[in-house]
Amino acid sequence: MKDNLTNNKFLGNLAFILHAHLPYVRKNEKNSLEEDWFFQAVLECYIPLVRVLEESIKLEPDNAKLTISLSPTLISLFQSAELQMKFPEWINTRIKLLEELPEKQRNASQFLLKNMSDQLNYWEKYSGNILNRFKYLLDSGCLDIITCAATHGYLPILRENPETVIGQIKTAVRHHQSTFNVKPLGIWLPECAYYENLDI
């Protein structure tokens, strides 16, 4: 192996593929667990990921490359105008709680306060439309976005009804195409579960 490296021989490729999914479970009640789950993921995962990728384009435009699968249900949550409006209130509630901590806990909260404020500023800069930032990264060539089964259904269990499997995949492809104006380059199989003859 060392000889191969010193002779500059091509050894292969490494692909980093992230999988992003949340179920589309909505409740009308205020402060529902499902909304909290989505907002926390936006705060701690999706905004930071988009920001790091945007920064990588500035620093090394030719070297930045990543693949992510965005499930149709997660995309639908990103597209929800109601959730886009609720996120600032959700994060401001947490900021107020951090500001009310006793003095001896203040040092620990400063990092969280700054992080939450930064993420909220980013959210507001783009009017809560994080999905458009993913589109920007896709169009820039630094990010490949693939799809997943429409409802993240476990396909090996669904194979008894082939129409269901086909429906899951075709619906996901249509949803991806209508969102990003391109067909997905691939699909992430839910739970990485494959069965023989799954190829469609």
Regions found by a protein language model. Give the residues of each.
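Carbohydrate-active enzymes and regulators
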Residues: 1-200
